[in-house]
Amino acid sequence: MPFDAVQLVGSALRTLWLLDAIDDSRRLTDFGRSLAMFPLEPQYAAAVLASVKHGCTAEVVSIVALLSSSSPLFPDSSSQRDEANEARMKFRHNSGDHWTMLNVFRAYDEVCTSEGKSGRKDWCRRNFVNQRALREAENIRTQLRGVCERVGIDWSSSCGDEENPLLRSLLRGLLQHVALLQPDGTYKQVMGPSVRLLKSSPRKLLKKKRSSRFTRAPF
């Protein structure tokens, strides 16, 4: 097996072990079998299952659907950076990326109830968000809701605007993406095959205040 393939397999096994999806003998655990019920990356499935305990499945399913989309939610708008930042300001949340993404999805859901195709397209254009990503996320969310119903999970369970239940659920699955603020202003990823130093950016974090920790989310 090529060296790169060995690394990929090793990384995948390590992720499953950190999630408690496999035991020390690499056998699938009961939790791992539960993860396998969802057509998701294991870390996202873990977040969905954790959301049941914290009462925020509706929010986690929406966020996971967006994270699973093949298109970025915020397309490159370098030629209109100032306009894009101003338009997206209304969605920003102090807790970071994931709540910001949820705010966008919630706003789009409201638009979908009152606007036709042209109105939805215009809303996305004015707010510099990718409609393709949102439409794909809608389809993924519908599929995930169906899985939840089949396995007896109430996907409508909501935490409203409470931050902690959602963040705790996401942390259950995204442990490898957690980073801590260092004295020099960089962030050190706390898990992974090697220590990584990360620099936050306004576009990435969509936050004005530096947090002592953050969980990265791809846009």
Question: What are the functions of these language-model segments?
Answer:
Residues 1-219:
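Second RecA-like catalytic domain
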